[in-house]
Amino acid sequence: MSTYSLSPARRAELNQKSNWRGTLEVAKDWALVIAGFAISLAWPHPLSYVLSVFLLASAMAGFAILQHETAHRSLFATPSLNEWVGEYLAALPILQSMPSYRAYHMTHHRLAGTPDDPDRIMTESYPVSPGSLKRKIWRDISGQTGIKSIIGLMGMYAGYWKYELTGKVERLMPAPQGVSGYAKKFIGNNGHIAILWQFAIWGALYALGNGWLYGLWAIAFIFVLPTCMRIRQIADHAVVADPLSKNPLMHART
């Protein structure tokens, strides 16, 4: 396996944080959301709806990437922008929680290249048989993965389950006490804002006389996004040179 190193000047350039570039990245993803809906608003046709779904799923994947960058505090030079934008403009619209993701993801980085890496369960079985891969993709495109994700994320907001991205189910202990305890936890984790984001998107479309187009957003989230994220995970961590190496060049591709 060949490796190369970046010059100090190039490395400094790549590590430079920028508020305006971070703002541009966020604006581009939201522009993609607007474009996704605008196409179907302007040209109502089955082909337009299909294109809209894929554009919206692309934007959602972009929000997941923005959540990742803000979790690393690398998108903006101003720390408070990483916190606020990462949570309210990237994570919550796709039912995620940036603080919870950050805690989980930092554990992944700390343990990457070891058997204890929480993400390892998603790719350690690769390469899999064609039949196994087909079954995994079918679970994604049939909506099974997406629906389970929604249920899981709501439970994580409420403090019922521990935050996970692998499909692993683990009760969070100590558990909240009673319905009011779960409700307080849900609100404390901004679960209500994640729900309000869904109503806001529907409300904007309803005001334009096409509230039903929110269904395209739901379809993108439930049926397309899980497939995109699975392929991305496989590309990044499956069948790498040495999954148990502490060298990032050996246990990951990107």
Language-model segments: residues:
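Active-site recognition of the HExxH zinc-binding catalytic motif
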Residues: 64-76, 108-109
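Transmembrane alpha-helical segments that form the membrane-embedded catalytic/substrate-channel core
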Residues: 57-67, 97-99, 147-149, 217-243
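Juxtamembrane/interfacial segments flanking transmembrane helices
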Residues: 73, 77, 100-103, 211, ...
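Non-catalytic, topology-defining segments of multipass membrane proteins
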Residues: 1-57, 91, 95-215
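Active-site His/Glu-centered metal-binding helix of metallohydrolases
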Residues: 31, 70-71, 239
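Post-HEXXH active-site segment of zinc metalloproteases
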Residues: 77-91, 121
